[in-house]
UniProtKB/Swiss-Prot annotation:
This is Large ribosomal subunit protein eL15. Residues 130-143 have a biased composition (Basic residues). Component of the large ribosomal subunit. The ribosome is a large ribonucleoprotein complex responsible for the synthesis of proteins in the cell. It comes from Gallus gallus. PROSITE patterns: RIBOSOMAL_L15E. The gene is RPL15.
Length: 165
């Protein structure tokens, strides 16, 4: 179908030409329940929580992942919110056919045809995925300097004893 919000879709890279696909995805709202049998979590009481847990990623990135799983041959470019009710959130995901000649022959879009961009949505490389990884520019994103939270933590917690020369 055509994008519900053509202005937003175009800002995110959509073009009304062959090779571009729009998928509307419905995601159930709310937090994430820990999938354990009868609420039986073992270990210390601090880890006994089952119900009021929050998923680390946004519902928008979940929608992108589901669209990417469903359309394995397409590449997820971006996505945007289109609506919500009490139970669901609705997102539209922009997908690109990497083998379409309109995409492959255009210098502006042929970057997504390269194999390194397979399943960007699974690896947190889309805009929505990067948000939950804490990546960005400026003083608000100092905790991911070095590529990721873990890389920044590792560098700051590694003791280096330089040999005296």
């Amino acid at each position: 179908p055509r994008p519900t919000r053509p202005d937003k879709a175009r800002r995110l890279g959509y073009k009304a030409k062959q090779g571009y696909v729009i998928y509307r995805v419905r995601v159930r709202r709310g937090g994430r329940k820990r999938p354990v049998p009868k609420g039986a979590t073992y270990g210390k009481p601090v880890h006994h929580g089952v119900n009021q847990l929050k998923f680390a990623r946004s519902l928008q990135s979940v929608a992108e992942e589901r669209a990417g799983r469903h359309c394995g041959a397409l590449r997820v470019l971006n996505s945007y919110w289109v609506g919500e009710d009490s139970t669901y959130k609705f997102f539209e995901v922009i997908l690109i056919d990497p083998f379409h000649k309109r995409i492959r022959r255009n210098p502006d879009t042929q970057w997504i045809t390269k194999p390194v961009h397979k399943h960007r949505e699974m690896r947190g490389l889309t805009s929505a995925g990067r948000k939950s990884r804490g990546l960005g520019k400026g003083h608000k994103f100092h905790h991911t300097i070095g590529g990721s939270r873990r890389a920044a933590w590792r560098r700051r917690n590694t003791l280096q004893l330089h040999r005296y020369r």
